[in-house]
Every structure is written in C-alpha cells, then in structure tokens.
Design a protein with these regions (language model features):
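Conserved short alpha-helical segments that host acidic/polar catalytic motifs at enzyme active sites
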Residues: 1-179
Length: 181
C-alpha cells in the first residue's frame, strides 16, 4: 500500500523556516536504515536527549527536538538492523539479508528503546525506508492522537475532525490512541 504523511507545523522550539518543515528525513544507503519523522511535539528534556546522542558518538546537524527525536529513533533502528544482520550474515547473501531484515524489524522494540527517555508531549508519525509506518503518543496523553481504520485505509491525526471530514466518518468511528502507544 501507500503511505502518505502530512503535517501542519507551527514552531514552538527551533526555527520557523524551511529547514524546520516536517517531515524530517534521515537517509542511508541501507533501505532499512532510512527514516522519516513528522509530528506535534515539544521535548522538555531536549538537552538531555541531545547529550545522550553525543555520548553515543553522534553529531546531530541541529539542536532541535525534531532532529534529536529522529536521531534517537535512528540510533535504535541502526542497532536493530545491525543485530539482525549479525545474527544471519553467515547464512544468507547481502541481498537476501536486506529482505529478511526488512520483514523482521521489531518496530515496537525500536520505538520503546528510543522513546524511553522522551519527556514532554508528543504525537508523531514516521516511516522506515522499507515501508513500515508508525504512530507514537506520549505516555501522559499531553498531545492528542486519533485514528480510523477500515478495509481500505488506516489514518492517524492529532485532530479528530480532520479524519471525520476527510473520510466522511462519524465521531464514534474515530478512536483515540491510548497514551504511551
């Protein structure tokens, strides 16, 4: 299927220029290590998260919560890809490994590890290079996040009326994503 991501950004932290427009893209030659992130969030511990990245040996290109969040997820994505590669490299060629890694990535594990230290409100979506997509909401439910699903589409948005209007569905068919999911 297709994955479409849209985001209306209003700047609360970082710049209000074209370089701050979502989605943010993290590119890599390995398809499974590519990452796109967009969302409504404000990390209150961005300095701490940024410092964690520096301690991992990374050098993020910007000091914004969006880049910090993306690189934090990217670190654990890379870690998971490497783990799967190391487990299987003796048994498969690299082309086969690429497909196996894409099908066996543990997205929940990646996001749980990456978001462990996130503090603040967030509702975000993202996609990995091989096509798997995700949504993520802060554990305290500070930022809203809703979803609708039928036989043809799965959609998530931070505003219920956006889903209701676009897909012509009644209020009761649009569900709130539980905090921490």
């Amino acid at each position: 299927g297709e994955v479409l991501m849209g985001h209306l950004r209003y700047g609360t932290f970082g710049g209000n220029d074209l370089d701050s427009v979502h989605p943010f893209v993290r590119e890599n030659n390995w398809i499974t290590r590519n990452l796109i992130v967009a969302g409504n969030f404000n990390m209150v511990n961005n300095e701490f998260l940024f410092q964690q990245l520096l301690e991992l040996g990374q050098h993020p290109k910007q000091f914004t919560d969006t880049v910090t969040v993306m690189e934090k997820i990217g670190h654990f994505l890379d870690d998971e890809v490497q783990r799967l590669f190391d487990e299987r490299k003796e048994y498969h060629d690299n082309k086969t490994l690429t497909h196996l890694i894409a099908s066996d990535l543990d997205i929940q594990r990646i996001l749980t590890r990456a978001s462990k230290d996130f503090e603040g409100g967030f509702a975000m979506c993202g996609m990995f290079g091989h096509g798997d997509a995700f949504v993520l909401r802060d554990p305290n439910g500070i930022r809203p996040l809703y979803f609708y699903q039928d036989d043809e589409v799965v959609v998530a948005a931070s505003e219920r009326p956006a889903i209701m209007t676009t897909f012509n569905v009644p209020f009761e068919k649009v569900n709130e994503l539980k905090p921490g999911h």
